[in-house]
């Protein structure tokens, strides 16, 4: 504990590690066609690795040329899972769409699994995973 932590009251929470969740992602197909209305389906499985039930939400962030619907207007999606017990898994399916303005290349999709306390406005911990979608 440093002097700044002592002055400002930052304390380490005992027994709470940073690897609270395990995120597995399967993408079908691995790539989508460029300059066409085409989509890939993400199958996301989140597992609670902690020994207590956690209030859980998942946030998915896409680049500007991809979206969650055919018009690709929304680029971020929050899915409120609810209470996820110890060693429980939750499976979610999401479609990621490319449009006529999607150029060929590799695009990063960011996934965040967050644990909350009280309600969804307070974040206790988060785990991030990045996957790549190829556009050809």
PLM feature segments, named:
Residues 74-100:
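Intrinsically disordered, low-complexity Pro/Gly/Ser/Thr-rich segments with frequent PxxP/GP/PP motifs
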Residues 49-67:
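Short acidic, flexible loop segments centered on an aromatic residue
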Residues 29-37, 83-86, 100-102:
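Short, solvent-exposed beta-strand/turn "edge" segments of beta-rich domains on protein surfaces
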Residues 43-49, 95-97:
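Short edge beta-strand/loop segments characteristic of extracellular beta-sandwich folds
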Residues 100-136:
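Terminal connector regions
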Residues 22-24, 65-80:
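Short beta-strand and strand-turn-strand segments in soluble, beta-rich domains
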Residues 36-43, 88-93, 105-110, 126-128:
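Short, solvent-exposed loop/turn segments enriched in Ser/Thr/Gly
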Residues 3-33, 136:
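Low-complexity, acidic Ser/Thr/Pro/Gly-rich terminal tails and inter-domain linkers that flank the onset
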């Amino acid at each position: 504990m440093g002097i700044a932590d002592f002055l400002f009251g930052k304390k380490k929470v005992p027994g709470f590690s940073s690897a609270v969740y395990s995120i597995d992602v399967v993408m079908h197909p691995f790539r989508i066609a460029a300059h066409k209305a085409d989509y890939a389906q993400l199958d996301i499985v989140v597992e609670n690795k902690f020994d207590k039930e956690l209030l859980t939400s998942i946030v998915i962030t896409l680049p500007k040329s991809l979206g969650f619907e055919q018009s690709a207007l929304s680029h971020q999606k929050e899915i409120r899972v609810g209470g996820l017990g110890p060693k429980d898994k939750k499976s979610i399916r999401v479609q990621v769409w490319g449009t006529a303005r999607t150029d060929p290349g590799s695009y990063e999709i960011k996934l965040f699994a967050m644990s909350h306390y009280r309600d969804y406005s307070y974040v206790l911990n988060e785990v991030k995973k990045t996957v790549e979608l190829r556009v050809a």
